[in-house]
Amino acid sequence: MEEGPIKKKLKSAGQGSGKTDAFRNFEQFFFRLNTLYTFLICRKHVVPTFKTLCGPIETALKRTVTKEDLAMVMALMPRECVFKYIDENQIYTETKIFDFNNGGFQQKENDIFELKDVDDQNQTQKSTQLLIFEFIDGTMQRSWSASDRFSQIKIPTYTTEEMKKMISKREALFKSRLREFILEKEKANLDPFSELTNLAQKYIPRERDYEDPIEAMMKAKQESNEMSIPNYSNNSVITTIPQMIEKLKSTEFYASQIKHCFTIPSRTAKYKGLCFELAPEVYQGMEHENFYSHQADAINSLHQGENVIITTSTSSGKSLIYQLAAIDLLLKDPESTFMYIFPTKALAQDQKRAFKVILSKIPELKNAVVDTYDGDTEPEERAYIRKNARVIFTNPDMIHTSILPNHANWRHFLYHLKLVVVDELHIYKGLFGSHVALVMRRLLRLCHCFYENSGLQFISCSATLKSPVQHMKDMFGINEVTLIHEDGSPTGAKHLVVWNPPILPQHERKRENFIRESAKILVQLILNNVRTIAFCYVRRVCELLMKEVRNIFIETGREDLVTEVMSYRGGYSASDRRKIEREMFHGNLKAVISTNALELGIDIGGLDAVLMCGFPLSMANFHQQSGRAGRRNNDSLTLVVASDSPVDQHYVAHPESLLEVNNFESYQDLVLDFNNILILEGHIQCAAFELPINFERDKQYFTESHLRKICVERLHHNQDGYHASNRFLPWPSKCVSLRGGEEDQFAVVDITNGRNIIIEEIEASRTSFTLYDGGIFIHQGYPYLVKEFNPDERYAKVQRVDVDWVTNQRDFTDVDPQEIELIRSLRNSDVPVYFGKIKTTIIVFGFFKVDKYKRIIDAIETHNPPVIINSKGLWIDMPKYALEICQKKQLNVAGAIHGAQHAIMGMLPRFIVAGVDEIQTECKAPEKEFAERQTKRKRPARLIFYDSKGGKYGSGLCVKAFEHIDDIIESSLRRIEECPCSDGCPDCVAASFCKENSLVLSKPGAQVVLHCILGHSEDSFIDLIKDGPEPNMPEIKVETVIPVSEHVNFSDDFKIIDVRRATKDDTHTNEIIKKEI
């Protein structure tokens, strides 16, 4: 048989040197590899691991097969092969049984909806990485991912002839590449075999080290500094914002997603002089001696002894106002002290750093003690600060629990206290705001009445307050406040882009995933050196966006940029957050992905762009986030990527509302509640402990009528006044939580490579949705497999894995009344309204594994105990004739109830003081309501609301809603009917706070529900109601809501309020009458 050209070439290449034999052996190895691989893939459908391939080849060749052998094949055919480590959790290693009667190995058919017990599953989910080799040359393309396991397309079984053709085609390509390589190296007078073995070294895969992401970031930055690489690599190429917008339009993924693009013109600076002379030394700490007009106005007002509220835009230099005011007084009065109050420790640390930078430039103040006083301050440091501090940076919690009850140790500080600064005043709202306002009144009372310090002034800042003067008066219990709102700071042009992901092919409603769209945009911004902060409205979106960005960098060969972007949110350890803040501040990160944790004014350096992954919770949040960009007076970009929720799509349709930068009316009223007895009593008890209460003296600090009633009924009296009750002793402030009760924290422990470090802390209420055995927990965009969840010891152990699927919990939440304490009728209706004990039951019964295309690839069962939360709330059972009208009109009942609940919750702030998360309801999930199959879990036709804070006794908010329910429902109905939208929007029945994205909504159904509850006759409104089915929802095939039938028990001391007569269509009132008799 005549020798082929390749064999002739091999002979001439290394006759007598052994090289010919080496290449011949290499050829034989490839033949065996090619044949075995094709057979395994086409007939056995098994994973081609290194171990699986080695055994048969070693038997045939009678030699050891090494990684270098496969790496040499990779070196010749880099585009046709894959040789890498993959995580065992990424693939499915199916157990096979050999059966001669049925043709060999048998593989089990998989049903993705068959629940597998997680305990059994975890026995096979080890963290080992598998080394695989595969051909991806188009002959038999395959990608080993979890989705293969459930592919709906059966992998074909090839005939022997077809397999031979595959083998021959691949071998021909191999020989061609080998021949070309030998010729090229010989032409260069190089040894071909040595060159091939050397080249193969770079193709030998190495197991992933799974380094901690924060450590990886710090290591990369350190190496960059050591190599003297500027942090702003390629920064010489500056992309302007208009250029960046055009570049986005020219990307391959652009398909007319930009629906609106607005430009707010730049603004020049306005300067103004002071009406008095600052201490000359003050100017040593300033970069320039000119003041913006609003800075001068505020400093002048403070000099005249006024209380000041500043509402100019974000990054307009508000901080400098109170910094300079304090420094001037420090220089003029050596005894003066100052208190800076911030809502978070991070913000306090940030402001202390900025303040110290100014002080460091003023020699006369270099010895002034300026420090933070918070929960992290060590005991020995606290004593020193109490005795020596001139300026403290603290938070409301420390004032409440440490400074006020312990005020004797703060005698000197409080006696000389000149200025109290409360930044980010808009944070103090709802229950928390009411608590903090009472703390401020206790502080003012002590300074006035005990330390005779009548010169105390207050200064506050916020860019997003609806009624700033009134809010500040309420917060501090003061009568006069000066408003500074004319902004004199310069700004560059601000560009606002509204981006709507494209509708997917063959879908009428479903759009491209907004997280993936946001990731593509963020990558482009980073590549063009546009320093960006991306805001996400919840933690999970933050992590998923981080994951997508990392994947894009890896897929596009830009692994060098992986450490240039980090995520930042609550739950991360304090040390990790400080490291990320520091790197961002010094310009070492090109982007940061955050929840609203960075919405506050923490200085993280100059930013060019804000990317919003989904619309924020409120218009105030939108303006706070948008204001983070453009801090160097350059042009800035705000780019909003809309999700498919009705709220986001509303702003896509009506973007003009986003331009109302200074329209205070678009912000929520932040009214404070001083009539909530539950809140008020706690602070009066604390105040009595700090200084005995005297009615005439103290009525200016607390509501007079409530003060007298609480003192007489709940406090002890002697000749000195009223003292705290024994129930609150020995330390009343410990009995009063400003934040509605702190939850237990669960530690997330990373056990990868024996690391055993806590990477996050998670609230107990979140664990059911984030930590379950076998689930994927995402941290810094990397997936971690939950190996152990211990609810008793409050920890979870997680291990880093490399998979491209995530897990979505399968859960349900039932909110049900347990006991009736109060019952009343409406003014013009027989429908009863109930108030009493509420039980919320959260059950996670399993989870889906979901690939990056949102396809379900597995279903796993879990056995977590239910989470039960007891609270207080109110509920209204939907009248039966409302159900009948909805059915007659073909309206979805679940959507009707859901829409009515949203409308009522949206109206609550007009009648009671409640934040968006302080009263909650049972939201309707699209997975259930839009299901194809009938569900056994039917829910009663009921509107229900409950206090989310205050524990089993509630916060007192729902009982106030109960008192005002007539006006609330009437106003809710009026708002729906006056709203011009067709299917629901944030102004009527859609809600940004909805946990289910407001997808199950029926605006006309909500009208029916509220009309019927208010007792309106069908004839009076039926013609105004649009017929269904609703165009904003898919075809509804199952009914999930049934009339209320279960009986709710009455409490032993229940009360009937304003009962008019028996209801027409149920037996509730009969039960009431029996109970009353």
From Swiss-Prot:
It is found in: Nucleus. It comes from the Eukaryota. The keyword Transmembrane helix does not apply. Keywords: ATP-binding, DNA damage, DNA repair, DNA-binding, Helicase, Hydrolase, Isomerase, Nucleotide-binding, Nucleus, Stress response. Disruption phenotype: Leads to increased mitotic recombination and spontaneous mutation, as well as to sensitivity to 4-nitroquinoline 1-oxide and cisplatin. Also causes hypersensitivity to DNA interstrand cross-links (ICLs) and telomere addition to DNA breaks. CDD domains: DEXHc_Hrq1-like, SF2_C_Hrq. One of its GO terms (biological process) is interstrand cross-link repair. Optimum pH is 6.0-8.0. It holds the Pfam family MZB. The keyword ATP-binding applies. Induction: By heat shock. Residues 299-483 form the Helicase ATP-binding domain. InterPro entries: DEAD/DEAH_box_helicase_dom, Helicase_ATP-bd, Helicase_C-like, HRQ1_WHD, MZB, P-loop_NTPase. Signal peptide: none annotated. SUPFAM superfamilies: P-loop containing nucleoside triphosphate hydrolases. One of its GO terms (molecular function) is telomeric DNA binding. Belongs to the helicase family. HRQ1 subfamily. Helicase with 3'-5' helicase activity involved in genome stability. Functions in the RAD4-dependent nucleotide excision repair (NER) pathway and plays a critical role in DNA interstrand cross-link repair. Unwinds relatively long duplex DNA up to 120-bp and requires a long 3'-tail of at least 70 nucleotides for efficient unwinding of duplex DNA. Activity is significantly stimulated by a preexisting fork structure. Shows both processive helicase and DNA strand annealing activities. Present with 259 molecules/cell in log phase SD medium. PANTHER family: ATP-DEPENDENT HELICASE HRQ1 (PTHR47957:SF3). Forms heptamer rings. Interacts with RAD4. This is ATP-dependent helicase HRQ1. The lineage of its organism: Eukaryota, Fungi, Dikarya, Ascomycota, Saccharomycotina.
